[in-house]
């Protein structure tokens, strides 16, 4: 495996020096992992954020984020302002953006109106028409790597069948529930799905607040996808929410209870399938406690609202 390039404050300084003639007033690294690094800087009156990855494939994701953010902003969704995406200055993918004002929604207790706002923004995002399904869509000029149909996406990209096999192999679902899932997954390719833009991870951790009870930005568009809305969006967005928060989100989205009921089973199926790779990792790590929690969760033991 090729050794990854080292990312330091000097790496970030080189990017800022190329695009801004004014001297940096401050430069600090906010956080960094094995492959993703985030820096904050002040240049004149500008407060900026620089994201750098030492994985070359990340350039595609940065380009996708840039397209998705602009498309969503055109629908009046509050988003970060991405100024530049490239890999020519430091031979690594980077993204320069203006710093978002506000605080993370996870930093304080919030009311139901924030969830209504999230739902309304989700509806606006999902109103952006796109072509094809998955990670490669309108932002890219590529043609050979596209999934042109929902059926192709499920088989070749999402790999729904393999996810079911993972659940079966590790005996996560009770036999009767596994049987129901297999029947539902066989029906998925035949459902009428039209692609639109999805944020892909519209949860509280990706929401910034302005301190006045309003959302100032929807952030972290790495998982943006051209997919079937609202089913795909809801499968993740509703995952962490309590019943009151779910109802507020759906109210903000503008979907009536009867309409939601029609798609609720599909949302459940997608949600369960999302666990496939996570379960495989837990099994590989021999994390029996995690597998027991998944078994409890996915068989409905934690659902206090239905029989």
Regions found by a protein language model. Give the residues of each.
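An alpha-helical support segment within catalytic cores of ATP-dependent transferases
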Residues: 3-23, 127-200, 210, 290, ...
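Active-site Asp-x-Gly
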Residues: 195-197, 203-262
């Amino acid at each position: 495996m090729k050794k990854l390039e080292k990312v330091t404050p000097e790496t970030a300084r080189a990017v800022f020096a190329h695009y801004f003639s004014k001297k940096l007033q401050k430069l600090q690294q906010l956080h960094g992992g094995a492959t993703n690094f985030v820096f904050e800087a002040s240049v004149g009156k500008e407060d900026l954020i620089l994201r750098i990855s030492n994985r070359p494939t990340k350039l595609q994701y940065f380009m996708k984020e840039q397209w998705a953010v602009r498309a969503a902003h055109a629908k009046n969704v509050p988003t970060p302002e991405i100024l530049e995406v490239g890999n020519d200055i430091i031979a690594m993918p980077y993204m320069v953006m203006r710093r978002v004002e506000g605080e993370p929604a996870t930093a304080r207790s919030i009311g139901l109106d924030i969830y209504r706002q999230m739902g309304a923004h989700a509806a606006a995002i999902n109103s952006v028409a796109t072509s094809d399904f998955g990670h490669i869509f309108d932002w890219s000029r590529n043609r050979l790597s596209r999934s042109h149909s929902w059926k192709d996406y499920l088989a070749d990209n999402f790999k729904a069948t393999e996810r079911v096999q993972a659940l079966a192999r590790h005996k996560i679902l009770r036999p009767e529930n596994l049987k129901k899932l297999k029947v539902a997954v066989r029906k998925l390719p035949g459902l009428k799905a039209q692609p639109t833009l999805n944020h892909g991870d519209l949860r509280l951790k990706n929401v910034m607040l302005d301190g006045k009870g309003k959302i100032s930005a929807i952030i972290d568009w790495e998982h943006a996808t051209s997919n079937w809305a609202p089913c795909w969006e809801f499968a993740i967005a509703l995952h962490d929410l309590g019943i009151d928060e779910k109802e507020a989100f759906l109210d903000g989205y503008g979907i009536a209870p009867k309409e939601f009921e029609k798609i609720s089973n599909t949302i459940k199926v997608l949600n369960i399938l999302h666990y496939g790779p996570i379960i495989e990792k837990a099994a590989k790590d021999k994390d029996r406690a995690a597998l027991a929690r998944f078994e409890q969760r996915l068989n409905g033991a934690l659902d206090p609202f239905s029989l």
